[in-house]
C-alpha cells in the first residue's frame, strides 16, 4: 500500500475514483461515510440500511446535502440517481452488488447470517468485498476467500479492525524472515463472561452503542472472534482454550507472551492471545537466531532478547476502512484474508443454564458467549461454531460454562450460512458430524 495517497490523488485528477457500495449505516458505516468525504480518489455513491432514515442520518453526519440524496427501490433507480450526482439510498442490500459502477462492497452489518448472502452476491457480481463482519469471516471466511479468488476478486478483512492491524505487523515480521512467537491485541479490562445486555444498558447509552454490541466486547466474544480471524489468516494457534489474557504493559509484552521456558505464559511459540492493559494497541512478539541481527536489535533499543516487540498503539476501526477498499482496486491486495484451511474455531459457551427446547439468541445476548480453541480440539469434541448458534433449538439441557455441541441441538436450521459452512467443512479432511 506504498504511496496510496499519491495513487488516490491520481484517480481524483483523472475523474476515476474508487467506488464503494456501503451496506450498513450504523456506527461503523457512519464513520466510513464521514471519512470517505474527506478523501480524494474515493466515493461512496450507494448506501444501504434497514430504513431510509438511518441511511439519511449517516449521510447527514457526513455533511452530505439533502438534495444530494435519493431514496431508491431498484437497481435502475439507483443507477439514475448516481448518474445525476446523488447518493442512492436503499433498504434492499441486493441492489448494491448489482450496480455496474460499484467496484467494492463493504459489509458493515455485523450479522453472520446476512454477511454470507452479501458475500456470495458480491463475489458473483465480480465486486471486491471488504468484510468488516468478522463474525462471518470466522465462520465461513476460508471458503468465501476461495470463491472470491476463483472469481478474480479480492476478499479482505478491514483495515482498522484489530485482525488487520495485527496482520500488518505479522506481514512485516514474516517478510523480514523473523519467527513470530505471539500475536495479539490489548483489552482495557478483564472479561466479564457472565455479562448481559441488561446489565450493560446504562454503559451502552453513555457510549451511544447498542447494549448487545457492548456485551459482545465485555463477555469476550468479540476478542475470541478477532483472534480466531488472525489465527485463520496466519496459522498461529490459541495456546489454551479461551487464550491466556495475561496482564502486561507495553514494556513487558514480549516477556509475558513467550514460552514458559523463557519466563512467559505460553506452552509453545506461535500463539494468538490478548493482553489486559495495552488497549487499544496490537502487537507481535518475534525472535531470530541470527547473532548479527540480535546485536542490531539491541542497538535499536528493541531489548536484550531473545524476544522482541512490534507494537501498533492504535487501531482506528471504521476510520481506516476506506484504505482497504482503495487497496483492493489499486493494488489487487487484501488487508488480510483466511488461509485455505482454518486452524482455529470460535465456539459457543453457555452463559447460564440452558434448557432443552430453548432457541439460542445472538452473539452478545443472554444464552452463550464466544470463546476460541484449535480447530482440531473443536472437531474432536464436535463443538458448534459460534457463528451458527443463533436460531438453533436445544435438544438437551446444558450446564453453565459448558461448550455447546452439534449433538446438543434438535437440528440445524437450513440457512445459507449453515449450507456454506457445510461446504467449507467438506473441503477439509475430517468434517464434523452435525
Language-model regions, residue ranges each:
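C-terminal catalytic/substrate-binding lobe primarily of soluble NAD(P)-dependent oxidoreductases
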Residues: 2-11, 202-203, 207-434
Amino acid at each position: 500500500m506504498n504511496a496510496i495517497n499519491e495513487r488516490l490523488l491520481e484517480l481524483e485528477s483523472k475523474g476515476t475514483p474508487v467506488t464503494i457500495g456501503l451496506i450498513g449505516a450504523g456506527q461503523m458505516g457512519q464513520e466510513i461515510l464521514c471519512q470517505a468525504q474527506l478523501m480524494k480518489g474515493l466515493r461512496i455513491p450507494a448506501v444501504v440500511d434497514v430504513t431510509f432514515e438511518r441511511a439519511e442520518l449517516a449521510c447527514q453526519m457526513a455533511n452530505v446535502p439533502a438534495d444530494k440524496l435519493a431514496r431508491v427501490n431498484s437497481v435502475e433507480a439507483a443507477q439514475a440517481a448516481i448518474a445525476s450526482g446523488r447518493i442512492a439510498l436503499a433498504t434492499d442490500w441486493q441492489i448494491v452488488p448489482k450496480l455496474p459502477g460499484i467496484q467494492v462492497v463493504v459489509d458493515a452489518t455485523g450479522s453472520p447470517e446476512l454477511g454470507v448472502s452479501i458475500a456470495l452476491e458480491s463475489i458473483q457480481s465480480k465486486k471486491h468485498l471488504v468484510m468488516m463482519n468478522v463474525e462471518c469471516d470466522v465462520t465461513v471466511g476460508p471458503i468465501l476467500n476461495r470463491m472470491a479468488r476463483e472469481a478474480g476478486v479480492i476478499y479482505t478483512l478491514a483495515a482498522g479492525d484489530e485482525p488487520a492491524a495485527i496482520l500488518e505487523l505479522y506481514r512485516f515480521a514474516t517478510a523480514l524472515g523473523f519467527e513470530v512467537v505471539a500475536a495479539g491485541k490489548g483489552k482495557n479490562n478483564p472479561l466479564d463472561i457472565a455479562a448481559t445486555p441488561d446489565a450493560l444498558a446504562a454503559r451502552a447509552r453513555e457510549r451511544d452503542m447498542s447494549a448487545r454490541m457492548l456485551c459482545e466486547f465485555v463477555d469476550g466474544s468479540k476478542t475470541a472472534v478477532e483472534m480466531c480471524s488472525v489465527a485463520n489468516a496466519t496459522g498461529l494457534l490459541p495456546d489454551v482454550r479461551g487464550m491466556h489474557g495475561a496482564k502486561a504493559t507495553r514494556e513487558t509484552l514480549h516477556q509475558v507472551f513467550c514460552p514458559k521456558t523463557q519466563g512467559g505464559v505460553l506452552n509453545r511459540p506461535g500463539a494468538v492471545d490478548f493482553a489486559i492493559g495495552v488497549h487499544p494497541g496490537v502487537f507481535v512478539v518475534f525472535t531470530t537466531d541470527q547473532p548479527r541481527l540480535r546485536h542490531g536489535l539491541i542497538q535499536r533499543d528493541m531489548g536484550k532478547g531473545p524476544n522482541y516487540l512490534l507494537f501498533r498503539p492504535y487501531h482506528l476501526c471504521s476510520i481506516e476502512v476506506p484504505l482497504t477498499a482503495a487497496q483492493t482496486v489499486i493494488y489487487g491486495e487484501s488487508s488480510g484474508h483466511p488461509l485455505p484451511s482454518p486452524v482455529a474455531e470460535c465456539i459457543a459457551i453457555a452463559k447460564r443454564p440452558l434448557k432443552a427446547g430453548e432457541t439460542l439468541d445472538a452473539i452478545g445476548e443472554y444464552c452463550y458467549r464466544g470463546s476460541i480453541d484449535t480447530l482440531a480440539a473443536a472437531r474432536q469434541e464436535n463443538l458448534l461454531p459460534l457463528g451458527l448458534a443463533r436460531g438453533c433449538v436445544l435438544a438437551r439441557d446444558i450446564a453453565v460454562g459448558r461448550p455447546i455441541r452439534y449433538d446438543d441441538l434438535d437440528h440445524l436450521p437450513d440457512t445459507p450460512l449453515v449450507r456454506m459452512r457445510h461446504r467449507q467443512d467438506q473441503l477439509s479432511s475430517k468434517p464434523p458430524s452435525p
